[in-house]
Amino acid sequence: MFVWHEYENAAEAAQSLADAVADALQGALDEKGGAVLAVSGGRSPIAFFNALSQKDLDWKNVGITLADERIVPTVHADSNTGLVREYLLKNKAEAAMWIPMVEDGKTETELHPDAVVDYALKHYKQPDVLVLGMGNDGHTASIFPKAPQFQTAIDGSAGVALVHTTPVTAPHERVSMTLDAIAHTGHVFLAIRGEEKKAVFDQAAQGENREYPINLVLNHQGVNCHVFYAE
């Protein structure tokens, strides 16, 4: 199921999402003294990252990781790691602990997908709070509808938290949280922007439709997803 939150502009949506995520992190900190946040990459989250980085939280007890990552060097322009380091791990959030998916210092030829997944799994901590995005094809994290590993990514019986995925419609091999790992996250948020993505979301939210991976999140009985939307 999901709860819809709509805002007049992207700045308002980013600030409201930062408020909600900070509240969820504070709840985890109060309950167990620590919290783990997983975020998504791309250009859309930058305003949200900036707002969240200024929140008054006990950041030294917060771990920050990714919902998914491109298997590229962490200094590559397409690296989500680099994006988070630049826009989120700053201001007050600079004190947070980074939980890596891809090892620093590796060249592209040194980054073999299976080894990257093994490395990410060694560092993996189950998130308390997760912020997802959604592509125009309905993918979320790096669970792509036509990827050869799609079934593995959505099959919860194996209890696997991270998988290697190969997008057919996007560049770079990926490492991604699985549907099972997403469903085991206490607080799940989805940020979408623009009429085109809203149209995809509206289609994906109807019934059960594996053509849109986000549908599997929205209809998962273990997930209560808060959707933040602005044109």
Swiss-Prot record:
It catalyses: 6-phospho-D-glucono-1,5-lactone + H2O = 6-phospho-D-gluconate + H(+). One of its GO terms (molecular function) is 6-phosphogluconolactonase activity. Its EC number is 3.1.1.31. It comes from the Bacteria. Pathway: Carbohydrate degradation; pentose phosphate pathway; D-ribulose 5-phosphate from D-glucose 6-phosphate (oxidative stage): step 2/3. GO terms for biological process: carbohydrate metabolic process; pentose-phosphate shunt. Keywords: Hydrolase. InterPro entries: 6-phosphogluconolactonase_DevB, Glc/Gal-6P_isomerase, NagB/RpiA_transferase-like, PGLS. Pfam families: Glucosamine_iso. Belongs to the glucosamine/galactosamine-6-phosphate isomerase family. 6-phosphogluconolactonase subfamily. Hydrolysis of 6-phosphogluconolactone to 6-phosphogluconate. This is 6-phosphogluconolactonase. It comes from Neisseria meningitidis serogroup B (strain ATCC BAA-335 / MC58).
